């Protein structure tokens, strides 16, 4: 398959799945298997196009970030708490990620692990949706520190490919009584430091390939994938918050279970 077409397809997969509770990393791993791509060749590409999804969050919520930034300059309590909560949620996965990244990549990056994680995550969403009590709408700067730390600890589960970073953080938030819209937006905002950190770490680990031009794919493919990921992720963010505020997360749970089961069957028959 043409590399530009491959870049477009993977950009669509990344943009569609990054902020939905279905695991973008898991879907990229399965897409690589399904279409027969060279996983090593496209590994760096899959990391870099996540920056397109990050940019989508910044564009969608730039007014929020501007207001928080101005509030920080004025030392406003709500803006200080916003930053405190974001850092408190980011730090657990940053520490654990640095400590365990190489082991997780080696031991848990297989398609079968992704499938089982999709199924387990789907069941967890159904259980949490059934039993979690919805809190009152509130902003991230109004959440107590313990809830922010809890969301950060939940994010650590997403180091297993197929669990889903957004799924883990949103479900962790719901389990602690945070209402759906705030849970989703907290997950979006938390993606920025988390994904920037992960991408920076990958780029540093692969700096020789970057400088030597041996990344496996060219800058044109990366540019196309980045742009497609950005556009698709922006559309998903705008639709997702409104949808889950009304309908909840059960459809994503059933999708995860079905996708994991079908993929397991396909892997077994290859």
Curated annotation (Swiss-Prot):
UniProt GO cellular component terms: plasma membrane
E.C. no: 3.6.1.27
Pfam family, one: BacA
Domain of life, source organism: Bacteria
Free-text function comment from the UniProt entry: Catalyzes the dephosphorylation of undecaprenyl diphosphate (UPP). Confers resistance to bacitracin.
More info: Bacitracin is thought to be involved in the inhibition of peptidoglycan synthesis by sequestering undecaprenyl diphosphate, thereby reducing the pool of lipid carrier available.
Protein name (record): Undecaprenyl-diphosphatase
Lineage: Bacteria, Pseudomonadati, Pseudomonadota, Alphaproteobacteria, Sphingomonadales
């Amino acid at each position: 398959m043409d590399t530009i077409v491959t870049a477009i397809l993977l950009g669509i997969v990344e943009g569609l799945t990054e902020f939905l509770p279905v695991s973008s990393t898991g879907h990229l791993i399965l897409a690589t298997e399904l279409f027969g791509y060279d996983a090593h060749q496209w590994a760096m590409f899959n990391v870099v196009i996540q920056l397109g999804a990050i940019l989508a969050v910044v564009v969608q919520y730039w007014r929020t970030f501007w207001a928080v930034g101005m509030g920080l300059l004025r030392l406003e309590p709500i803006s200080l708490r916003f930053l405190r909560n974001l850092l408190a949620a980011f730090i657990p996965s940053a520490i654990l990620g640095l400590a365990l990244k190489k082991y997780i990549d080696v031991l848990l990056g297989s398609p079968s692990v992704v499938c089982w994680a999709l199924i387990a995550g789907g069941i967890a969403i159904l259980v949490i949706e059934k039993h979690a009590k919805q809190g009152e709408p509130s902003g991230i700067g109004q959440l107590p520190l313990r809830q922010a730390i809890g969301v950060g600890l939940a994010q650590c589960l997403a180091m297993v490919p197929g669990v889903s970073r957004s799924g883990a953080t949103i479900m962790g938030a719901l389990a602690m009584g945070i209402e759906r819209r705030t849970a989703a937006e907290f997950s979006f905002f938390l993606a920025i430091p988390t994904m920037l950190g992960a991408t920076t770490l990958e780029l540093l680990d692969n700096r020789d390939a970057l400088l030597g031009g041996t990344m496996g794919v060219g800058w044109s493919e990366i540019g196309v994938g980045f742009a497609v990921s950005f556009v698709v992720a922006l559309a998903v963010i705008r639709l997702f918050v409104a949808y889950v505020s009304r309908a909840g997360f059960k459809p994503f749970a059933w999708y995860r279970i079905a996708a994991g089961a079908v993929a397991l069957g396909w892997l077994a028959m290859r």
